[in-house]
Structures are given as structure tokens and as C-alpha cells.
Amino acid sequence: MKQRKLKTKWMLITTTITFLTIFLFSIIIIFFLSNSLRHNEVDEAERSSEDIVKLFESKQIEHVTPLDLNASLGNFQKVMLFNEDGHKLMETSNDNSITFSPNIVPTNVNRIAVKSDHKKDYLIITDHIESPKFNGYSVIVHSLEDYKALVNSLYFIALIFGVIATFITAIISYFFSSQITKPLILMSNKMQQIRRDGFQEKVELSTNYEETDNLIVTFNEMMLQLEESFNQQRQFVEDASHELRTPLQIIQGHLNLINRWGKKDAAILEESLDISLEEMTRITKLVEELLLLTKDNNNSRDGEIENVEINQEIASRIKSLSQLHSDYTFEFDAFPKPLNIKIDRYQFEQMLIIFIDNAMKYDQINKYIQIQTKLRNKQISIEITDHGVGIPKEDIEFIFDRFYRVDKSRSRKLGGNGLGLSIAKKIIELNNGTIHVDSEVDKYTTFKITF
């Protein structure tokens, strides 16, 4: 089905609405106007009939002349005089075109009636005359042809006016619809250009229409988000490929080493297998974290949400880590009252381990980790501080990006792949939390998580 242009549709709608409005308005006006004119015709005929009755009440019939009767008649009228038996006594008219002469039946007289003769309409007013001087009937024949011609002229004028108004409306609608759709057409052309040339093109238009200007702003913002998302996705693929390439090359190198000398040399075989298994573990962890990030990007909260008392969870994690890393000092300053948040317990533990593990990696000299919980303004905060190498201020805004590492060589030696903080931030955001970083190079780094 062929789609119509918005400009054509707008013009058709406005023209149709205008035509229907004028049509209905004209019908209503003509209806009331024709009724008013008809009442005027009836009033005029009744006045003439009343004058005729008064004339015969004041004069003997023998003294009434046609001139007297004509003086009582209005325009386009004829009068006929009947006795009580229905016999016509006289008639006169001021309009020779009125040839219609109705008869009356004394036993069945309608005072006001409309009759037709040769496709002409007449208003008939019949009055009974009772006076000492004459008894009978006066009949006024009032032509309605002038009234009909006037009403027909009104219909014709309304039709001409409607056609002219509709035509003018169509022209105006075409002009305005062209003005309204012009920015949309320009936007469409610009979008096609963007599709051909890429995200670097932006729609730069000012239409003086709030709606279309807002649409352009929204479109440009959407394009910026798409460009950013596309660049992040491309960078993500490049970084993931790089991270996977290194351990795979190491594994391939050691497999070649085993194939060449390891079959006969047990030491080379064992060393190569250990290194290959270590790299396989790194790959497995990397893939698991990538899958977790992908799931989190879909705003997934598949875990069981429960009330978690964070002081107990942190104390439990610190106890386990202290036994595993006895050379580290963990200082926990817990809020004196229980602090409960609604979160998936596994996600909370994972987030906590990521931050503590990150603090331990970058504090290899002092090996002193501080953890503090607070409650302020109904907000629960967790602060994790290490006293290691710190983060340069220019790098702080990027540390939550995937695969981003402040010191790539150091991070790889420590077993990092740049995904941990991204995962932790996703967990925090999924649970309506925020994260703030404060750091000074070679002094400290503090991660503050707020729920």
C-alpha cells in the first residue's frame, strides 16, 4: 500500500475540516434565515388579510372598489372575496403573474395553508368576515416565488463561498504544510546522509517550531549516545580480542615447546603445562566476567533480593582474607548499629571482593586496608581505602571502563584484566547505588559506595 505524504495528508485534513465547517455553518444559517423570511412572508400576508377584514367591516360591499382592495394588499398578493356559500364575489391583484385562484369550502376552511400551482408555491390566508354590512370570506393569495428565489440565492451564495473558502484553505494549508514538513524532510535527508557517512554528521537546523526543534535536539542526543555506544562496543571488541590473544599466544607457544622438546624433557613439560593451565584459568575468568557484564548490561537482577546486614558480611570477608593473606592488615570501622540493604547476597559479596582485591593489588608495600561503614541521612555508605600507588586524577573518570588499567604492565603482572571495577559499578547501579573515588598518587585511594 502506497503511503501518502504528510504534507498531502495535512492539506486534505485541513481542507476537509474547513469545508465541513463552512457547509454546516451555512446550512444552519440558511435554515434559521429561511425560517425568519418565511415568518415575514406569513406576517405580511396576515396584515393584508386583517386590513381587508377591517375594510369590509367599515364599508358596505357595494362601496368597496378594487382600488380599495389593492391599497390593503402587499407585494405579490391577490385577494378574493367569497360569500358564505363559497361563491366568489370579486378578486383583484397587484401582481398579474398570480393566476392561481383557489376555491373554498365553507364547511372546511383552513386559515393558513400553502398550495402549489404549476410548480409555484402560494401562501393562502383565509379569514371569516362577520359584520352587519357583510358576511363571507376573504382569501389572500401570497406568492412565495420571491421568497424561494431569495432562499435559492442564499444556497448559491453559500456554495460559491464554500468553494472559494475551500480553495483558499487548500492553498494556505499547502503553504503551511510545506513549512511544517520542510524541517522533517531536511531531517530525513540528513539522516540518510548520516546513514551513508557515519555518526560524525549532525542535524543542524533551526525551524522556529518548538516541537521540531526539540525533535532535532533529541535526535542529535540519540546520535551522540549511539556513537558513544558504537565506539565503546568497538573498543570493547578490540580490548577483548587483545586480552584473549595474549594468553592464547602463550598457550600456543608452550604447546609448540612441548611438541618440540617437552616430550622427552619432564621439566619443560611440567613448566609449560603449568603456564598453559594458568593462562587457561585467566581466559576462563575473562570469559565469565564478560558474560557477567553482558548480563548486567541488560539490567538483569536474576538473583534473590534479600535484606543483607552489611557489617556481618564485611566482617566475614575480612576474616577469610586475613587468614588467606596474613601479611595484610585489615582495619574495619563498623557503624555501631546493624545496617541492612536489599540486595542479592552473592552480588554484594562479589562487589566487596572486587574492591578489596583491587585495594590489595595496588598496595603491595604498606599492605594496610581500611574499611568503614556509615549511616547518614538514611544513606548507607561503605568506604574502602588502600595506601598504595594511587590513581592520577586524569585517569579517575576512566577506571570503570572495561579493560581500562592505569598501569597496564603492573595490572597484568598482578593478574588483572580491567573488568573488575566495571562489574562492581554495574552491580552498584543495578541496586540504585552510587560510587565515588578519591585518590592521591603514591598516598591512598578511597572507593565510597553509597546505597
Curated annotation (Swiss-Prot):
Q: Which residues form the HAMP domain?
A: 178-231
- Pfam families (UniProt xref): ArlS_N, HATPase_c, HisKA
According to UniProt, the reaction catalysed is: ATP + protein L-histidine = ADP + protein N-phospho-L-histidine
Ranges for the Histidine kinase domain? 239-451
Question: Where found?
Answer: Cell membrane
TM stretches of this protein: 12-32, 156-176
Broadest EC class assigned to this enzyme: transferase
How would you describe this protein's topology in the membrane? Answer: Multi-pass membrane protein
Sorted keywords for this record are: ATP-binding, Cell membrane, Kinase, Membrane, Nucleotide-binding, Phosphoprotein, Transferase, Transmembrane, Transmembrane helix, Two-component regulatory system
What EC number(s) are associated with this protein in UniProt?
Answer: 2.7.13.3
InterPro entries listed in its UniProt record = ArlS_N, Bact_Sensor_His_Kinase, HAMP_dom, HATPase_C_sf, His_kinase_dom, HisK_dim/P_dom, HisK_dim/P_sf, Sig_transdc_His_kin-like_C
**GO CC annotation terms, alphabetical:** plasma membrane
Q: How is it modified after translation?
A: Autophosphorylated.
- Coiled-coil features, chain-numbered ranges: none
Q: What terms describe the molecular function in GO for this protein? A: ATP binding; phosphorelay sensor kinase activity
In this chain, where does the modification Phosphohistidine occur?
H242
* Purpose: Member of the two-component regulatory system ArlS/ArlR. ArlS probably functions as a sensor protein kinase which is autophosphorylated at a histidine residue and transfers its phosphate group to ArlR.
Q: What is this protein called?
A: Signal transduction histidine-protein kinase ArlS
Q: Which species?
A: Staphylococcus saprophyticus subsp. saprophyticus (strain ATCC 15305 / DSM 20229 / NCIMB 8711 / NCTC 7292 / S-41)
